[in-house]
């Protein structure tokens, strides 16, 4: 697949009409979704990569690409794949008619390597420093549009943000003692969240964080937020509300749950969806009135 040009923003007029109620403002910088689909999880079927497993009649990777393809505010999509399934993903992208997928690139051995490869490619493509980059695990197929919108909006105030879901369980921080783990501390539950994706950044921020991390051969982060937290500690990372349904499909045992979520999504009544959106708008308006 050949690389297509990334969208460049048009000059912003001096005066713009206010957006219609319930719509989101247009973006004046590129908003690039990086879909990470390069993993071959050891906890899944090694002969059947989970990104290509069908859930609800559609490959998992397509669910994730769909979410960004259908978001009007996302301008470009980069898909990072394992070379072993590159052909299959290219075929799917062509069959599904994704117009925002600019390039499909090979990932690295670890997640952090795949992100670094994508950032290098974006730099080569001339992406501006203030571009908004949303990095998403392909195996989180049910990310909601509200999480994507929230991530884009958060970058108007912060240079880094992550979707996260408030923990309903007490979280224990542990340390080793002999052959067992023991409790070291118990953080207050209201302050504990389960990290999800997308994790979003202004391009200059995440690029700088990765440049600093590259000098540390012992650093192996499990997500991109960790890179910013560890190497740019003065950069706050905003929390964007996630959802329990934004699960990460890690093992075969996750598939039945994913199928149930897919059935619920596919079976939603359009009238019920419209009613839910109206309730959300009313709740948002009420919240603004009480500020």
Curated annotation (Swiss-Prot):
Reaction(s) the record says it catalyses: 2-C-methyl-D-erythritol 4-phosphate + CTP + H(+) = 4-CDP-2-C-methyl-D-erythritol + diphosphate
Organism: Bifidobacterium longum subsp. infantis (strain ATCC 15697 / DSM 20088 / JCM 1222 / NCTC 11817 / S12)
Protein's pathway: Isoprenoid biosynthesis; isopentenyl diphosphate biosynthesis via DXP pathway; isopentenyl diphosphate from 1-deoxy-D-xylulose 5-phosphate: step 2/6
Disulfide bonds: none
Lineage: Bacteria, Bacillati, Actinomycetota, Actinomycetes, Bifidobacteriales
GO MF entry, a single one: 2-C-methyl-D-erythritol 4-phosphate cytidylyltransferase activity
Role description: Catalyzes the formation of 4-diphosphocytidyl-2-C-methyl-D-erythritol from CTP and 2-C-methyl-D-erythritol 4-phosphate (MEP).
Annotated site residue numbers, Transition state stabilizer: 43, 50
Region (Disordered): 1-23
E.C. no: 2.7.7.60
HAMAP family: IspD
BP GO annotations: isopentenyl diphosphate biosynthetic process, methylerythritol 4-phosphate pathway
Key words of the record: Isoprene biosynthesis, Nucleotidyltransferase, Transferase
Broad EC category: transferase
Annotated site location: Positions MEP for the nucleophilic attack: 189, 248
Membership in a protein family: Belongs to the IspD/TarI cytidylyltransferase family. IspD subfamily.
Protein name: 2-C-methyl-D-erythritol 4-phosphate cytidylyltransferase
